[in-house]
C-alpha cells in the first residue's frame, strides 16, 4: 500500500468515526442520563473539584463503544479530534486520568446504573439500524474472583463457583454475551456462576430477530434444546452455525475434512469479532 493510499484509508476511518459519534450525539438522552447519575456523583465538597459529570459520562460511553482500557480511552481522547470534540475538551488538562475513569465506572456499577444505560444504548442503536440484528455471535468468558469473595451480607458469595477449563481450575463467575455479527457491538450480557454451561444460556443471548447464530463448540446442540429459539420473529428458521470439535472433523474422510475445515474457518472468522469484546466486559463486571 502506498503512503497516499494509506492516508486516504486513514481519512475514511476518521470520517466514519466522526459520523458514528455524530449519530450517538443525537440519539443519547443526555439530560435524562445526567439527571439519573447526578445524585450518585461526587459533590466536590472536600478535596479536589470533580471533573464535570458530562465529561465523565461521554468518556465512559466512548470506552464502551470502542472497547478501550481506561488509559487508552484517555490517550485517544487527547489524540483524536473526533473523541475530543465528542467530549467537549480542547486540552489534555480537561481530560481525567485512567484511574478517575475507573472510579467513575465502578460508581455506576455499584449504584446499578450500568445495566440501565447499557440497555438504553442497545435499544437506541437497534432502533436506528446501527445494530442490524441479522445474526448473533454467542460466547462466554470466566470472570475470576478470589476464593474469599463475599457478597453484601459479608458471606461467601453463593453465586461464585469453581469450574475446570482445560487443566486449570477457576473460581468466580461467567459472562455470557450476544454480539451483533455485523457491527461487532454487544447487545446482551448475562452473568452466571462460573460452572454454568455455555449452551444453557444461548436463548437468553438472542434478540429473536436473527437469521443465523454463531458459537464455538461449547454451544453444540443449542438449536436442539427444548428452550431453543428455532424461528425468528418473521417465522424464518434460524441457522445455528456452531463450530465442530476438532476430533469430529478428524473422523471425516479426506474430502470431507477439506470441506469441513473450510466451513469451520468461515465460522471462526465471523466469531473472531467477539474476542476483543471480553476485555471491556471483564472491566465492566468487576469492582
Question: What is the predicted function of each stretch?
Answer:
Residues 53-64, 279:
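Contiguous, well-ordered alpha-helical segments that form the cores/surfaces of helical PPI scaffolds
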Residues 29, 48-54, 93-96, 266:
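Secondary-structure capping and boundary motifs in well-ordered enzyme cores
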Residues 4-7, 211-212, 217-287:
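Helix-centered, glycine/charged polyanion-binding patches within enzymatic domains
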Residues 34-54:
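An N-terminal domain-cap segment
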Residues 1-31, 38-39:
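Charged, often Cys/His-bearing segments associated with DNA-binding zinc-finger transcription factors
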Residues 53, 62, 71, 75-78, ...:
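Polybasic low-complexity intrinsically disordered regions
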Amino acid at each position: 500500500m502506498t503512503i497516499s493510499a494509506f492516508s486516504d484509508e486513514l481519512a475514511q476511518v476518521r470520517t466514519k468515526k466522526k459520523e458514528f459519534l455524530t449519530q450517538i450525539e443525537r440519539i443519547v438522552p443526555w439530560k435524562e442520563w445526567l439527571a439519573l447519575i447526578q445524585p450518585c456523583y461526587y459533590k466536590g465538597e472536600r478535596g479536589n473539584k470533580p471533573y464535570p459529570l458530562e465529561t465523565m459520562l461521554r468518556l465512559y460511553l466512548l470506552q464502551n463503544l470502542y472497547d478501550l482500557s481506561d488509559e487508552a480511552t484517555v490517550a485517544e481522547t487527547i489524540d483524536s479530534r473526533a473523541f475530543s470534540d465528542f467530549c467537549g475538551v480542547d486540552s489534555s488538562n480537561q481530560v481525567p486520568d485512567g484511574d478517575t475513569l475507573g472510579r467513575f465506572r465502578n460508581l455506576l456499577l455499584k449504584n446499578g446504573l450500568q445495566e440501565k444505560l447499557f440497555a438504553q444504548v442497545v435499544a437506541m442503536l437497534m432502533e436506528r439500524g446501527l445494530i442490524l440484528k441479522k445474526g448473533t455471535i454467542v460466547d462466554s468468558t470466566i470472570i475470576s474472583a478470589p476464593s474469599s469473595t463475599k457478597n453484601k451480607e459479608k458471606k461467601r458469595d453463593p453465586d461464585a463457583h469453581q469450574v475446570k477449563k482445560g487443566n486449570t481450575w477457576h473460581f468466580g463467575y461467567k459472562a455470557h454475551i450476544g454480539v451483533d455479527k455485523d457491527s461487532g457491538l454487544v447487545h446482551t450480557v448475562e452473568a452466571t456462576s462460573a460452572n454454568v454451561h455455555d449452551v444453557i444460556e444461548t436463548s437468553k443471548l438472542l434478540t429473536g430477530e436473527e437469521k443465523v447464530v454463531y458459537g464455538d463448540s461449547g454451544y453444540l446442540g443449542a438449536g436442539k434444546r427444548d428452550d431453543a429459539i428455532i424461528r425468528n420473529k418473521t417465522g424464518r428458521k434460524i441457522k445455528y452455525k456452531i463450530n465442530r470439535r476438532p476430533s469430529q472433523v478428524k473422523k471425516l474422510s479426506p474430502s470431507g475434512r477439506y470441506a469441513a475445515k473450510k466451513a469451520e474457518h468461515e465460522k471462526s472468522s465471523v466469531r473472531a469479532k467477539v474476542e476483543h469484546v471480553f476485555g471491556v466486559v471483564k472491566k465492566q463486571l468487576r469492582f
